[in-house]
Amino acid sequence: EAIEEADFVIKLLEDYDIDGPVAYDWEMHDSSYRVYGTSPEMATACAIAFCQRIEEAGYTPMIYAGQYVSYMKYDQGAISPYLSWYPEYKTTSSEKLYPTFFYQMDYWQFSSSCSIDGIGGKVDANIQFIR
């Protein structure tokens, strides 16, 4: 199924000149999600399958995952060849603004409520780290 998802994304991207990474975002918030209960081995295999297919099509793959999925569902060693995008937001004004993720990350999403001139509403904000 992850390969089918990658093929779907590749088809959508055909008409665009993409120079940034293409992200795999596997989310599982609660037991109402179809993927709830997926083993770490299967979650990791799906992420890798998606990334391999995206790479075969000439794009740069990336894995987007929050704390639970990153620590409990993905084998970090197995997915380490791919770029990673990690969301972690400051929840109180007294918290320091830096990520607490133990593993290397390539992108850090530090906010979901930034204001950017020319864009209506709140948007996500990210920082890219250069390897």
Predicted segments with their positions:
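Extracytoplasmic/secreted cell-surface and envelope-processing proteins
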Residues: 1-2, 31-40, 70-76, 94-96, ...
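Substrate-binding cleft of extracellular glycoside hydrolase catalytic domains
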Residues: 1-59
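Short, structured secondary-structure boundary patches
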Residues: 8-14, 74-89
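Structural recognition of the beta-strand scaffold that forms the well-ordered cores
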Residues: 20-26, 60-65, 83-87, 106-109
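Active-site-proximal loop/turn and secondary-structure-junction residues that shape catalytic pockets
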Residues: 28-30, 67-69, 90
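Aromatic-lined carbohydrate-recognition surfaces of secreted/lumenal glycan-active proteins
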Residues: 54-72
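Alpha-helix initiation/capping motif
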Residues: 66-67, 75-76, 124
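Functionally critical loop-and-helix segments that line ligand-binding/catalytic clefts
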Residues: 79-131
